[in-house]
Design a protein with these regions (language model features):
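Bacterial Sec-dependent N-terminal signal peptides
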Residues: 1-25
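Intrinsic disorder/low-complexity segments enriched in polar/small residues
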Residues: 3-4, 123, 646, 693
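Glycoside hydrolase catalytic-domain context in secreted enzymes
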Residues: 19-658, 665-682
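Short beta-strand elements
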Residues: 683-693
Length: 693
């Protein structure tokens, strides 16, 4: 029997490697001051605006090289449309990794490290110094069509995945950019929204992932499009100076999102460093403010200095732009992408163990729906085309031969004659829009039509958020959430369908029964159409997004309000079975020291597989309204049939804390607490109690 200790912060073991690669802030700022003295006021004005759409301006004769910034979290978006394409030699190809929400479904910070490291290596090969990711906005509501770029609804899960992402990416010498800071949880006219978030919710939910990324050493942050309490985030001194720099301790480069700021004087004095992508007259406007004495040269120095210090600390000015040796690692990157897909695809339903399907059986397997030949992906800045893309029908026919056959528009007879129907559905989610909590109308019609006529229907859903499944979920025999699996996603999916791989993915968010159940229900302005027309965005009045649910985001809302979800946070099935036994606490009293919680997990089924042990905490008699439970630890365990392991978690007083709006600080109450151990937010096996003295 093995014993595993789950560390409080899983990135700690990697910080030593990271710290050896990046210069200390004091030394970097000293060198930055030396460079700053070489720049004229005109050069400083040019340096605080973007150049060539995705670059930081360089002055090579002064030892300052142009720096390339490129999207995004799920791989390198190869940009062949730069105003001046000769500034950089673009990669010929880049790996299309699974979407970050699929990565979050693995519940594996180690995979997050490997995933980001592989992306960083492709950045280094392509001369990209700063990757514009990870995106880590909290999944607040299911209609946000950018949820696929993020890591789900729980701040602890987000923090663990992001800290390892940052560490993995920056181990390659590529700078991470945490985005979008902050309160950017809807894409509905995002340049016209004003997020109203309580101090407590901001600290307990929306800042925690950013804090984890900063603590892991992230070297840049991108501000968001929206307003925070009535001021645009990218020009808000409160957001940048007070929260990001003073409260979270961020020392490095801050950039605006593209075309997201409006008042130049506020931008310059807010703590912002870099206006992107750089309006054509920005430099002249800066100099105009300077000559009008509305800003000083010190104001510009304060903007430029963190840009220089960040580039110096990362070694951007002292190294070869391209590391072409890393072009040999694409095959390794493909393997990582496939492993992530294998571990992140979620099996939600498996009636009568219809899955896995044995390829040696002579059955008629009808394939219909969408994404048959097309690779599903999210669109916008994060889009990655990939290479060696394998379609769904290609992957399935490799495994099953011609027993899998495709009919675009099957008749009732076609559907009834099939032994199994594989029904592929999904959405094409995209930055800058919201999408309905539903399949497209034609897909919904086909789903109802097929499930009505064949009880052995297995649905494959490729999407970036939850969707309404109320009309047909009960009629399905099987349901697989495939997300956006990247270039190898359908190969991984096929391995799960055949049983070559046992599914182990877990939902990083809740799938509600109806959108009306969501804590964000009613977030759109009264009378607004979901289908926003971006060309008219400037005509839309600024509207408030009131985060009235406060800290009750995701499962915190459903559990506390006793609303039954369709599928709960942390849920996902396997082809084998597990039991949790022998839960123990090292002490039933906590003072100022940690206590340990251990539990033994056994694979009681016939297949090897993996389970995610989830540890939630609850204050039994809180002094303020608190969630029914909060995720504090998790660990993914791989076991052969019959094997068992004992897992030990460390719980600290800090894990009991909530944000006190009166003292504006974290507070820990004395009293009774419960530890809940289980395999989802709604599947709790054991409850243990202890007293905080």
């Amino acid at each position: 029997m093995k014993k595993i200790i789950s560390l409080v912060f899983m990135f700690i073991s990697c910080i030593g490697i990271y710290a050896q690669q990046i210069m200390d802030a004091t030394a970097a700022y000293k060198k930055a001051n030396d460079l700053l003295e070489r720049l004229t006021i005109e050069e400083k004005a040019l340096m605080v605006r973007g150049y060539n759409k995705f670059f930081i301006k360089g002055f090579e004769e002064k030892g300052i090289l142009p720096i390339y910034l490129s999207d995004a979290t799920q791989g390198v978006n190869i940009r062949n449309n730069l105003p001046d394409p000769n500034v950089v030699k673009q990669l010929e190809r880049s790996t299309a990794f699974p979407s970050p929400i699929l990565l979050a479904s693995t519940f594996s910070p180690d995979l997050s490290y490997q995933y980001a490291k592989a992306i960083g290596e492709e950045c280094r090969a392509g001369g990209i110094e700063v990757l514009l990711g990870p995106g880590l906005n909290i999944y607040r509501q299911s209609q946000c069509a950018r949820n696929f770029e993020y890591f789900g609804e729980d701040p602890y899960l987000v923090s663990q995945m992001v800290s390892q992402y940052v560490t993995g990416l920056q181990s390659t010498g590529t700078a991470a950019c945490l985005k979008h800071f902050c309160g950017n949880n809807t894409e509905f006219y995002r340049k016209r929204s004003n997020s109203i978030i309580s101090e407590r919710a901001m600290n307990e939910i929306y800042l925690r992932g950013f804090k984890a990324g900063i603590d892991a050493g992230a070297m840049s942050v991108m501000t968001s499009y929206n307003q925070i309490d009535g001021e645009w985030a990218g020009q808000s001194s409160y957001v940048i100076k007070n929260i990001l720099r003073e409260k979270l301790g961020f020392k490095w480069l801050v950039m605006s999102d593209w075309n997201s700021v409006w008042n130049l004087e506020k931008v310059i004095k807010s703590g912002q460093n870099l206006e992107m992508p750089g309006s054509y007259n920005f430099g002249e406007s800066v100099l105009g403010l300077y000559h009008q004495k509305k800003i000083t040269e010190k104001d510009l120095d304060d903007m430029v200095r963190p840009i220089l210090a960040t580039c110096i600390a990362m070694g951007f000015y002292d190294r070869s732009k391209y590391d072409l040796s890393l072009l040999d690692k694409y095959q390794e990157h493909e393997k990582i992408a496939r492993q992530v897909a294998e571990e992140g695809i979620v099996l939600l339903k498996n009636r009568d163990n219809i899955l896995p399907l044995d390829p040696t059986k002579n059955r008629k397997i009808l394939l219909t729906g969408k994404f048959i030949y097309e690779i599903p992906r999210g669109y916008g800045a994060a889009e990655v085309i990939g290479y060696n893309n394998v379609s769904l029908i290609e992957a399935l026919q490799r495994a099953f031969g011609r027993t899998v056959y495709y009919i675009e528009k099957p008749t009732v007879a076609d559907i009834k004659e099939a032994d199994i129907v594989l029904l592929s559905m999904g959405t094409r989610d995209k930055e800058a829009i919201e999408r309905p909590f539903a399949l497209p109308k034609e897909d919904e019609s086909l789903m109802r039509y097929v499930t009505k006529n064949n009880p052995n229907t297995i649905a494959i859903l490729n999407t970036g958020s939850a969707i309404d499944m109320s009309a047909w979920n009960d009629r399905l025999a099987g349901l697989i959430y495939g997300w956006y699996g990247g270039q190898s996603g359908f190969e991984a999916l096929t391995d799960i369908i055949t049983g070559k791989v046992t599914p182990s993915g877990k939902l990083p968010m809740t799938i509600e029964k109806t959108f009306e159940d969501s804590p964000a229900w009613g977030y759109l302005p009264k009378g607004a159409s979901l289908y926003n027309e971006l060309k008219n965005e400037h005509l839309i009045n600024v509207y408030d997004v009131n985060y009235g649910e406060s800290v009750l985001v995701g499962y915190r809302w459903y559990d506390t309000k006793n609303i039954e979800p369709l599928y709960p946070f942390g849920y996902g099935l396997s082809y084998t079975t597990f039991t949790l036994i022998k839960p123990r606490l090292s002490s039933k009293k906590m003072n100022d020291q940690m206590i340990r919680c251990s539990v033994t997990i056994t694979n009681t089924g016939s297949q090897k597989g993996a389970e995610v042990i989830q540890l939630y905490l609850k204050e039994n008699q809180p002094s303020v309204s608190r969630p029914e439970k909060e995720l504090k630890r998790f660990k993914k365990i791989f076991l052969n049939s019959g094997e068992n392991q004992t897992v030990e978690f460390e719980i600290t007083p800090e894990d009991l804390a909530f944000w006190d709006d009166e003292t504006h600080d974290w507070k820990v109450n004395s009293g009774q607490y419960s530890i809940l151990l289980g395999t989802s937010s709604r599947h709790i096996s054991h409850i243990l109690s202890f007293t905080k003295e």
